[in-house]
Amino acid sequence: MQPSRSFASLFNSSFNSSSSPTLPRTPPTPWNPADESCCSEPDTYSTASHSLPGYKICRRELAKGAVWDSHCHLDFLARKLNRENIKGGESLRMSLQSDGQRLGEKFGGCIANFCDPRDWAQGPRSQEVSKILTSCKEQSGVFLTLGCHPHFADKMDGFCVQQLLRLAKKMKGRVVAIGECGLDKSGKNRVPMETQKKYFEAQIDIARELNLPLVLHIRGAEDEAKELLEKKKVPANFRIHYHCFTGTWKAAEAWLGAYPASKIGLTGLVTFDHARSVHEVARHIPLEKLLLETDAPYFLPSGVSKESYKHTFSQPGHVVHVAAQVGKTISE
């Protein structure tokens, strides 16, 4: 099966053909229909192999051997582009058409994460982002997650919770998870912990009601997150994407022991020499437990050619660099 040409042309490569990374070979993840009970058409869906184990993606969207970006932020990316004075409805498309070679069969698509309620609930920003959501809905090779990042938990209210549930139901089949959500005790987050917990719990409830995976953002609050998941009686076999993991392999192993259906997401951080704990995780984690992410527009991979890509932020196509570095780390 060939990847969507319309999507591949939207997200062009940012590297010259002479420096295209070599992608690791990963075995396919078997599809167990019993794990996909929330699919309305279980015979037409599969868990994606290669870089999206555990996510429900229509089989017709999957390309054999293609790498998918399991986590990016197209709304944040669009605003980055606008700050660079790239205007008009084609700004995203224009920006990602670099002078490098097209990704072709190496890049399958992405899961775009919308985690700021101001972007999907109500207000002027939601009107702007609704155009992106509509485009994603119509675009082959783009799937969505909806939720509230702990940094934005103070922007949530009862209306937002209901709107999140409504949108996830309305876009069933295109929305493949709830989140990113979770708890963050880092110095960058000033939202009170009680507020974070309140809306993390609300999103757990929605994920369980719709039988969708959770995409978790956890910083310095792993014990609290586990306690809350236990309080909500989230079963050990619930599907969880532990996004942007930066801890040690010991910590990852402990999490997988508690929630064995989880997947661990590694970002472009893995391409940097100083990220030793992330390298350790890449070296030891079973491939079927691994998800590849760009977290675009964050974590521009170190291997991106400055000659062919002029921006200072990442884009979904850069997941091929993440895949290449993981493959290199495994082989060392």
Regions found by a protein language model. Name each.
Residues 2-332:
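Mid-domain alpha/beta scaffold segments of enzyme catalytic cores
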